[in-house]
């Protein structure tokens, strides 16, 4: 019966392919090769299945049921299943679980929250006011004294002594300043009326003497 059904299936499939491949170029030749391969494959499958059925030994159902290889013993599994319920501990009641949770939460609620440190930047004026307010009056007075001494030292250093401003020879500088100021301030000397018979003398003789004195002092120093 199975061989007849397979033959009918192959015939219907081949007729259907021949009808659809009639317009193609080389369709019949291709269909013949495909049909031959299909027939050979189906024949091989039928042959192998029939051979396996003939060589397979027939066992009675009683022996198959008693075969230990097909049905291994289930004693270890039963022992394990019986031991597992004893090992498992019964779950705790809900009342005890709620009490444990309350005990764990109470210390966390009792602890005061940590003080948050403000990270805002303070201005220099706020910092200076806070530092001055926190200082003791005695310390504040000492700081003011130290600041006054520092400012006085700086002012003394900035103001040079008169000896340094005048130079290495203060007396010489003063003498030269006075001499030059007197020369600049003095005007042209008016010659006194002399008789016509006397020879005229130079009017700026004292100035020449003064210049000679100044030149000598400069050369000496």
UniProtKB/Swiss-Prot annotation:
Chain residue ranges for the region called Disordered: 54-156
Chain positions with N-acetylmethionine modification: 1
Biological process per Gene Ontology, one example term: cell motility
Stretches of the chain forming a coiled coil according to its record: none
Sorted UniProt keywords: Acetylation, Cytoplasm, Nucleus
Recorded GO CC terms: cytoplasm; nucleoplasm; nucleus
Cited InterPro entries: IER
Chief localization: cytoplasm
Triggers of expression: Induced by basic fibroblast growth factor (bFGF).
Signal peptide residues on this chain, from the entry's feature table: none
Subcellular location: Cytoplasm; Nucleus
Compositional bias of kind Low complexity: 125-136
Residue stretches of biased makeup (Basic and acidic residues): 64-77
PANTHER family referenced in this protein's UniProt entry, alphabetically: IMMEDIATE EARLY RESPONSE GENE (PTHR15895)
Function, in words: DNA-binding protein that seems to act as a transcription factor. Involved in the regulation of neuronal differentiation, acts upon JNK-signaling pathway activation and plays a role in neurite outgrowth in hippocampal cells. May mediate with FIBP FGF-signaling in the establishment of laterality in the embryo. Promotes cell motility, seems to stimulate tumor metastasis.
Similarity comment text for this entry: Belongs to the IER family.
Protein name per UniProt: Immediate early response gene 2 protein
